[in-house]
Structures are given as structure tokens and as C-alpha cells.
Amino acid sequence: ITSDGFIDRASVDMKSYFVSAGYYGENTLVKFITFGGTEKTYQAWNGVDIENQERTFNELGMYFDKNGNTRFYDNQTDNYNQTHYQLHWTQELNSKLNLNTALHYTRGLGYYEDYKTARKYKEYGLEPAIVDDITLKKTDLVRQKWLDNYFGGATFSLNWNANNLALTFGGAANKYYGDHYGKVLWVQ
């Protein structure tokens, strides 16, 4: 999907895929599935209020240069990639009993990048700048906020059906690891 967007600087470039393969036996079914995608979208998260006469105006990434001219940061974007893998196995053990199992793994990695004005140095773990013996406590900067995650696990169910009675026993075990961190790319 690609779009220039309705709101200024709100374009979208997204790609995705889906692949599935399987084995179908008399009493066995095995399927492998993978799907995922990437996206780069320019930020328009604030939307447009109904009172605003400029219906497509997007304030995100706006700053004023040293001459007081309005400028917009070119890479005010959200960038993310996620991939899923699944392996499913169903086995009919007899006419009354079947077993379903699945393994899954998801990998996600991405960031958003934005221009921030008048931010305190200490918010970003930076020492204040000293210019001509004057300590500056705030600055404009470009930052990235990252999401780096892994999620995997297994599920199962054992199903018994006989004499108008159905019983299911199942469970799952999952593990998630995620890290959120930031990077300062540029400071004025």
C-alpha cells in the first residue's frame, strides 16, 4: 500500500506477505505459515481538529530556522518490520481422540524518528551546552524511539469426543522479550 496521504506529509509505504505450506495425510495435518510486513509512514498522529481551516495541515516535525522561517523535518517517520512464523500439527490418534500443537515466533523491530523543539538536555541524559559562558538548558534535537521485541511459544490441546461428551485439555507456554530505547541523532 502506498499513499501520499490526505494530511500534509502523511505518506505511507507498506508491504506485506503471507506464505503457507502444508502436508495433509490420512490422520495428520502439518502446516507452516509465515507472514509479515514493513512500513514507513510519515507521522500525522495529531490529526486535524474540526476548527482548523487548513484541513490538511500537519504540525508534526515543524520548527523555525535561524531566520524565523517555518520548516518541516523531512524524516518525521514511523518505521517498523514484523515477521511471524507458525508451525501447526494436528494428529488424529483414534476416532475419539486428537491432538493439536503449535509453535510460534514473532520478531518485531522498528522506531519512530522525530524533530523535537526546546527539549531539556537532561531529559535525554545529555549535559547542558555552554556557549560564551552561558549554560543552555534546552535545545532542538532529532531522536529515535526504538521497539525491539521477540515473542515465541507453544500451544497444545488434547480433544476427546464420545457419547455426547466432549473434553478438551490444553495449555500454552510463551516467552516475550522486548526492549524500548532511544537514540539522539542530532542536537542543535
Regions found by a protein language model. Name each.
Residues 1-6, 39-41, 108-110, 176-180:
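Sequence/structural signature of outer-membrane beta-barrel proteins
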Residues 2-3, 70, 139-141:
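A short, structure-level motif marking secondary-structure boundaries and short turns
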Residues 36-69, 133-137:
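Surface-exposed loop/interface segments of Gram-negative outer-membrane beta-barrel transport/assembly proteins
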